[in-house]
Amino acid sequence: MYYQLDTGDDCDNNCYNNRLSLLYFSILLMLMGQLDSVSNVIADRLVYYRERGARAYGPMAYFLSVFLLQLPILVFNVLFYTIGMYPLTGLRAGSSYYGYFFFFMLMSSYCGMFMAYSVASIAKSTQVALSYFPAVLVFVMFYAGYAVYIPEMDDWQGKWLPYLSFFRFAFQGMVLNEFQDNDDLPKSHDYINKLGFDFISVSGCCGIMILFTCIFASFFYLAIRYIDFEER
């Protein structure tokens, strides 16, 4: 289905829809890969509480250890996935387009990781955290603009809920990167308008993804600093 996607005047609606689904589910794959992070944080939490109580290290040291250790792993995972998938599927040629694609995939991984860490940090047990994470994931998935296009959402939903979904901005950035001013996809402008992705640029989506990552990272840091489920 996704091997060397069609282009040109012969490209029908399936050609565009296949591209949208490929981009959407690529992001979802990165987020689902962070599910193990929930149980990992809770498993490490007892050690962190003990060491913090002994003044061996504080929340910032723990936060940095998590962040810095995961950085090369996520970069490798995203690179391994994208460097093969991108040419095989025939997505838009050009190093700059691949660079944006890689960026959004990497930032989706980071957002997903810190989202999982944030959920785990406010949950008392693994079971509770694993019930929170799917609920948050479904929310950001639904308001990404794929299952229901943003202009087709109810007024009160479409006006502000999509702005709370980092998934939406990763998806929008990747769609614009693939569709915008692409002569090989004659109907691309119509699809951009139909999705409601016509008023924030690719670079704007990059900035918003960085902002969301910082928000989730800050929330996680504040949670490990001030919440202690083992406190007596």
What is the role of each PLM region?
Residues 1-232:
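Membrane-spanning alpha-helical segments of multipass transporters and channels
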